[in-house]
Amino acid sequence: MQFIAQFRDPSTAENSDYERHLKRLWPVIATLAAKDDRLADWFLQGSNEEEARLYPVYDAPSEPSTAAKAVLREQYRGEDKLAKTIGMWNGRIEKKEGASISLGFDTGAIPCDFELTVGEENATSSRLGDFESVAEVVATIATTYAPAYITAAPRKYASKQVFDDKPGVGWMLYLPKPITSQHVPEAHALVPVATDGKQIGTIIISAIDVPFSINNPEHVETANRIEIRLVDQDLLPRYTDI
């Protein structure tokens, strides 16, 4: 399963502030760890397996490791004004147990991006739990980054979605606006996301009985119909407008 979000940092944000970005990410890590303890420990990615286990990202909850910060400062030395990416993985070699996070920032005029990929043991269940549990992960990403959208879908769904220039619905799509069943009657569930008691957005869910599968024609058809419905109402953003 792949989670993708795009967001913008404030214009006042300092470049090369690795500690801030890693601290900011922590609520997402904590939510993932609560779903699957194999998602509790993360390491900076390296050029080989041995190197990729050298640098834990965190020394303690919400505390980026001294080693990780030093590696990132050295990696991007002299590149303060250039875009940067922090790549990390959970140290698990087997695909079904593996996971990775990519966080892009200092991107200037274009959006920052967040990508989480979680390997699954099979196509009929999710390591993260049922749709409500997965929606909690999406909601945490939403409250952490205030993104323009979040998608949660199998990676291969990209070839099945209706529009190439807009996010797809897949299993779940978060949009930072109130969405009701009147907007998308095809949705199987709508989950409001709130911060400080105020709704900031909605998670649109296309399947609730089992995890979304691109091999299930009904799942793909429902997601596609939701995409068309959103575009008809000008509710689905174009990538170029984010």
Report each predicted region and the residues it spans:
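C-terminal interaction module
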Residues: 1-47, 155-242
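Internal, hydrophobic cores of structured domains that mediate oligomerization or house catalytic pockets
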Residues: 40-154
